[in-house]
């Protein structure tokens, strides 16, 4: 995964200094993913602004860049990432059973389940507004159209 200097400049312009520091703590693969998600929103900006307004567009863009920042608290290995992707479509009941019985697979799934909460907390500490925090918190369980848009592009990349 690579990030161009021009992309870092765009991210730095989009986020405040504390948010950019938080973005920069993410592994390179997460930074690339976050930029790809944010670019989807950027490329749809006219539609997003007309549907939800400029403030929500800006919140969505920032949330896209920071939505997985909670993962920066954990050292994910490649095999962990593969497991998470492969188990994404397992029924929740089955995943919860693995977590409940403290299996090795369950531990990986638990950490993945917690990253939105950790991300919300880190974003709050970085000065992100409550709407951005909620977008980060709910990016795997969207409850409104704006959250669904973030989830859609997150799942695409």
Describe each model-derived feature in a short phrase.
Residues 1-22, 142, 157:
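Non-catalytic interface/linker regions that flank or bridge core catalytic/transmembrane domains
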